[in-house]
């Protein structure tokens, strides 16, 4: 039957769906397609027809009694008892897979590329077995109930024991239902009474639902009359524990960057548990297994709900002290993270094999002197008050990464971007031009100060970034490009809207806008109104420090910024603020040009050629006795020596970690110049990269540092060579040249020259340099902007010019 569709042009047919069967033939009469055939490498390529019947068997009917024997021989010849070739091939592949496991010895790069974790040799199951007899004899532990060869639940054959934990012996077994897979059998909570039985049932329920790559996988739960509570069957993780890995090192501790990297690998698993409403409770190096390609948490027996009560399992020396009275919480897990990390990097004091509470101070522990940010992070994690610890593991992770950046920068000189910072980059600079600007008096006759001011410090400090999870974040980001007055009006309207009543960022946005408008007193009043609600928030302390700095209350500002640093030890912003405020206090006290530190302390604090861990403990003990510091290296000290020490140390730390924060380089140079460490000051300034727009200013400042009061001949000549490398088109070339020649004259009036090599193009004599100074002053007068100052420069040139007959 003809239809309308049949009459249409085939090229104009509509697109329509057809059933797709990848295994169906395209055409019934198509040629044979690709198909699987059985491959037997032992089979003959062709069948011989000679002497064979149609079934491939020889007719032995005429052989009489020999027929049966010959048929049996035929079966053997044909391979009737040979192993199936496909099974043999699969077994060969499996053996090869197992044999090559762990042969690729590659390190792993983690922590945003900052750390390369070393290769870890996988541990074969049989190597993990231990002899229980020593523990039974020495510690009085009950012997294992199960022995090698015992079968549990008609499935798991016991291979032996690998450890003894809070739930008894931990067994290694083979799962005969899953190709002999090696598993671990660990005891569950006892079920002697109904309450314990209910707890055990609940434990099984949430353990069964844990699915995270960083947590050991649970396979099964089994009951066995020999073990009350039964067993958890979990995967075997072949690798050493962090405790064994630490003890295998020669120093019995891990390098701090390696330890932090391992903890960063553990945090996602812990955070997963917290997101499911449970806490781990028993984090310690023994329960963290390092494999060839990942880190895993084992021993889920202590996991409990947040705020649970009853028997809460943990390990003394690691468990938070409030667990017994307040129950487990996220804060108690944060405590165990801090204790675990501390036990990996330092030798914590012990009593009867149990770690004592608290941390060694930087005075007692050289590692904490070198990496004070690590000490502050551990101190916050292990604070006795749970409310003062990190509120969650995401916050802790960000600060761990910041601390790791510092450690890598200080130890190896490698810098990485601050990808997780809570602050913006430095908005501008402070203290970068003062020393050079002082020589501008030769241009216009106007005297200038070399002191930094609170206003320029505050203008340069980084700003807190808006928390994107805050309800008012979108509104604040939308108003960031408006004028401050418009922004203030927008914020006022937002605060009257119920939608934003729970916002934290909007009230602080009001403070920030008031500061930008110069309404410092009003900003302080507004902050005071927020103290009850947000007093524990680090943003409150930050803005309080900013306001106090602008109002000249430097001691209070120091306390506020110290609180920020204690809460955010991995951030550079509070360190820069504290260094600047310490310098402002020294300026206010008239100590800006006085040497205050022990001879060994300045180079070590700068970290350019020495480290604080190399300074004898006696130096810091004396400082503590003099009140210049304390055991915790508190940054609220007011003694001039302590102010100089911390300012130098913090400027250096910020500069080494953040090479774009050039204010810290100039600040470090100023502190070192006060301590007469000229060479170190030059070294700090020389680290300003060529690509920086502050590079030329750093070079000019270095020249002026070389010719500062008390300059040696070597420094003066070095300053001249440095200036000659700068193009003469530099606007300040002549005035810097005047400073160098003048320093040479001052030196020659008190010392004898060691050589007659010229300085610039002038003989290195009093007469030669006087002539050179007069000539340079005349050159400077030609570019002076004001006639009066031009005449003054010419008069000065005439005064210093040596007397001549013509």
Q: Language-model segments: what does each one mean?
A:
Residues 164, 174-182:
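Conserved N-lobe loop of protein kinases adjacent to the ATP-binding glycine-rich P-loop
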Residues 169:
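Conserved N-lobe ATP-binding subsite of Hanks-type protein kinase domains
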Residues 274-290:
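Catalytic-loop of the protein kinase fold
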Residues 410-510:
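Regulatory extensions appended to serine/threonine kinase catalytic cores
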